[in-house]
């Protein structure tokens, strides 16, 4: 062995020894695996010894995925020119937990069938800003977060979420989904979903088939005109609802559709409302800015009996109210402040 090679070997061993005692992961990686990982690092990428399970291949101008070391947990491939996701490149990466493929050129046709399924331990998949026309299938069964915003997705294949009971977050913002794509059939299998983002699609109606576990629903920037009276009957846990920038008018909102004990955050900005809808006493944040509201009638918005009851524990929970961008003139009605005693901010 040459003196140079010997020196490099000694330095590598010393470097590894230093960082073995200061790993960022709670799960210890065996020494021999760490050595193998560092030595197998693709020449196009960066594998920092202090983050031994991570491989950084972002911003490298890559057109294909290099062969990834077997003990990789976190793989960063964003901001490249990758147009094919091959099973061969990831055949050794069976321990992957997190892969970031944002801002590439991957198409549905360029996604090989078994490329994702082989990653049986994957929990986070980022494929935002690509050229996908359909949701990738089959997906890893342990996946918890799937982020596919800003693609060209127009369809959700039936059964694509079958067996996806671990998925809690589904981000499909800024795609081309229409009403017939989001149904009970297409979403079947999402038994533990918490957040769904369907903002900036081409929906004309409220999406069907959302699981009862859903707590956050983002529907901003669609063409929704009405909400069915019983829509939230099957969604008992919804806490945050965003319907900004739709086409909602008073006629499209049944009187008590938002009078839900679970809802904490309701956003209806940039619609066509002329009146404040009925809200629940548990609501904490209400966004009604940039509508066509001319006045706020406290007797309509205030829950029954509140103005006559001075008990603090029975006060409505509203803390933040936006009414700017309407036709309302200051000052804020006194009855409004009397009703919502916990209000901390009113924008008018």
UniProtKB/Swiss-Prot annotation:
<keyword id="KW-0433">Leucine-rich repeat</keyword>
<comment type="function">
    <text>May be important in developing and maintaining corneal transparency and for the structure of the stromal matrix.</text>
</comment>
<keyword id="KW-0732">Signal</keyword>
<feature type="repeat" description="LRR 7">
    <location>
        <begin position="215"/>
        <end position="234"/>
    </location>
</feature>
<feature type="disulfide bond">
    <location>
        <begin position="302"/>
        <end position="339"/>
    </location>
</feature>
<feature type="glycosylation site" description="N-linked (GlcNAc...) (keratan sulfate) asparagine">
    <location>
        <position position="92"/>
    </location>
</feature>
<comment type="similarity">
    <text>Belongs to the small leucine-rich proteoglycan (SLRP) family. SLRP class II subfamily.</text>
</comment>
<keyword id="KW-0272">Extracellular matrix</keyword>
<keyword id="KW-0964">Secreted</keyword>
<dbReference type="InterPro" id="IPR001611">
    <property type="entry name" value="Leu-rich_rpt"/>
</dbReference>
<feature type="repeat" description="LRR 5">
    <location>
        <begin position="165"/>
        <end position="189"/>
    </location>
</feature>
<keyword id="KW-0844">Vision</keyword>
<feature type="repeat" description="LRR 4">
    <location>
        <begin position="141"/>
        <end position="163"/>
    </location>
</feature>
<feature type="disulfide bond">
    <location>
        <begin position="41"/>
        <end position="47"/>
    </location>
</feature>
<feature type="repeat" description="LRR 2">
    <location>
        <begin position="93"/>
        <end position="118"/>
    </location>
</feature>
<dbReference type="GO" id="GO:0005615">
    <property type="term" value="C:extracellular space"/>
</dbReference>
<feature type="glycosylation site" description="N-linked (GlcNAc...) (keratan sulfate) asparagine">
    <location>
        <position position="259"/>
    </location>
</feature>
<dbReference type="GO" id="GO:0007601">
    <property type="term" value="P:visual perception"/>
</dbReference>
<keyword id="KW-1015">Disulfide bond</keyword>
<dbReference type="InterPro" id="IPR003591">
    <property type="entry name" value="Leu-rich_rpt_typical-subtyp"/>
</dbReference>
<dbReference type="Pfam" id="PF13855">
    <property type="entry name" value="LRR_8"/>
</dbReference>
<feature type="disulfide bond">
    <location>
        <begin position="45"/>
        <end position="57"/>
    </location>
</feature>
<dbReference type="InterPro" id="IPR032675">
    <property type="entry name" value="LRR_dom_sf"/>
</dbReference>
<feature type="repeat" description="LRR 1">
    <location>
        <begin position="70"/>
        <end position="92"/>
    </location>
</feature>
<feature type="repeat" description="LRR 3">
    <location>
        <begin position="119"/>
        <end position="140"/>
    </location>
</feature>
<keyword id="KW-0716">Sensory transduction</keyword>
<feature type="domain" description="LRRNT">
    <location>
        <begin position="40"/>
        <end position="69"/>
    </location>
</feature>
<protein>
    <recommendedName>
        <fullName>Keratocan</fullName>
    </recommendedName>
</protein>
<dbReference type="InterPro" id="IPR000372">
    <property type="entry name" value="LRRNT"/>
</dbReference>
<feature type="signal peptide">
    <location>
        <begin position="1"/>
        <end position="26"/>
    </location>
</feature>
<keyword id="KW-0677">Repeat</keyword>
<feature type="repeat" description="LRR 10">
    <location>
        <begin position="281"/>
        <end position="303"/>
    </location>
</feature>
<feature type="glycosylation site" description="N-linked (GlcNAc...) asparagine">
    <location>
        <position position="297"/>
    </location>
</feature>
<feature type="repeat" description="LRR 9">
    <location>
        <begin position="262"/>
        <end position="280"/>
    </location>
</feature>
<dbReference type="InterPro" id="IPR050333">
    <property type="entry name" value="SLRP"/>
</dbReference>
<keyword id="KW-0325">Glycoprotein</keyword>
<dbReference type="Pfam" id="PF01462">
    <property type="entry name" value="LRRNT"/>
</dbReference>
<feature type="repeat" description="LRR 6">
    <location>
        <begin position="190"/>
        <end position="213"/>
    </location>
</feature>
<feature type="repeat" description="LRR 8">
    <location>
        <begin position="235"/>
        <end position="260"/>
    </location>
</feature>
